[in-house]
Swiss-Prot record:
The name this protein goes by in its record: Large ribosomal subunit protein uL30
Family of this protein: Belongs to the universal ribosomal protein uL30 family.
Gene: rpmD
Coiled coil segments of this chain: none
Cellular component, GO annotation: cytosolic large ribosomal subunit
Quaternary structure annotation from Swiss-Prot or TrEMBL: Part of the 50S ribosomal subunit.
GO molecular function, one term: structural constituent of ribosome
Length: 58
């Protein structure tokens, strides 16, 4: 499986509580924070729901 590099590019202030929970579930805490995760269908679903807050690199 590939790894994805996920970076938070927008603030979570004013977002839905569900989207904030998704950010924390991915391990993102603040703007500019980057995490590396294994690519999986579950992860892609999480990213899809908060696509306006994050940037993805393969």
């Amino acid at each position: 499986m590939n790894k994805l590099k996920i970076t938070q590019i927008k603030s979570s202030i004013g977002c839905l509580k569900k989207h904030k929970s998704t950010l924390y579930g991915l391990g993102l805490r603040h703007i500019g924070h980057t995490v590396i995760r294994q690519n999986s269908p579950r992860l892609l679903g999480m990213i899809n729901s908060i696509s306006y807050l994050v940037k993805i690199k393969d």
